[in-house]
Structure formats: C-alpha cells, structure tokens
C-alpha cells in the first residue's frame, strides 16, 4: 500500500533549516526578555517595528546563554537598533569647539553712571 502517494515516488528527505536548530529555553534563562517582547507586541497591535529593541535584547540573551549561535545583529536585521539607555543623556553633551563670538548680552546700567 502506498498510503496516498505513488509507490514509485522518491522518499521524502527533510532539509535542515538555513540557520540551524535552536534549543528550547527549558530553564527560562531568557524568559523575562521573551515576556517583554510579547507584552510590547500586544500593546502595539502586533506591530513588530515598535518592538525591535525587545527582539534584539531577547536574541542577545539567547546568544549569551548559548541557546543560539552568535551572529552579528546586522545579519539578523537588527543592526540599526540602538538602546536609548546606552546613549549619553542630552543634558551632559557638550560642544567640543568653543564659540568664536559669544552673543552679546546687554547689561543693565549701573547706579554709578546715572545722572
């Protein structure tokens, strides 16, 4: 019996995924990152563009814990995602070049020069 396919057909040979297989996170090492990502997806009506930072953090956790092979984030489509907490605050940024002509601020006349 052929059970739905011709008996002369070649045997099906599965092919492995292009990036290999990823072990499951049985110990929950990256569960917090996964929950953050899923929460973001729910809050943003499954718009993954708004949750790319969470996706990057989750993949970094998996790579750090050995749950997937280390790869460059650009290869994973997340090379342009920047963590805003890693940036210096805007108030502490200073200019490196001094002002050549500082703006003139008029001063009120002193009482000594009044007539």
Curated annotation (Swiss-Prot):
GO cellular component: mitochondrial intermembrane space
Sequence motif: Cx9C motif 1, positions: 30-40
Tagged with keyword Transferase: no
Keyword tags: Cytoplasm, Disulfide bond, Mitochondrion
Disulfide topology: 30-61, 40-51
Disulfide bond recorded as keyword: yes
Polar residues: compositionally biased ranges: 90-99
Localization per record: Cytoplasm; Mitochondrion intermembrane space
Sequence segments annotated as region (Disordered): 1-23, 80-115
Residue numbers covered by motif Cx9C motif 2: 51-61
Role this protein plays: Required for the assembly of mitochondrial cytochrome c oxidase.
Protein name in the entry: Cytochrome c oxidase assembly protein COX19
Organism field: Cryptococcus neoformans var. neoformans serotype D (strain JEC21 / ATCC MYA-565)
Lineage of the species this protein comes from: Eukaryota, Fungi, Dikarya, Basidiomycota, Agaricomycotina
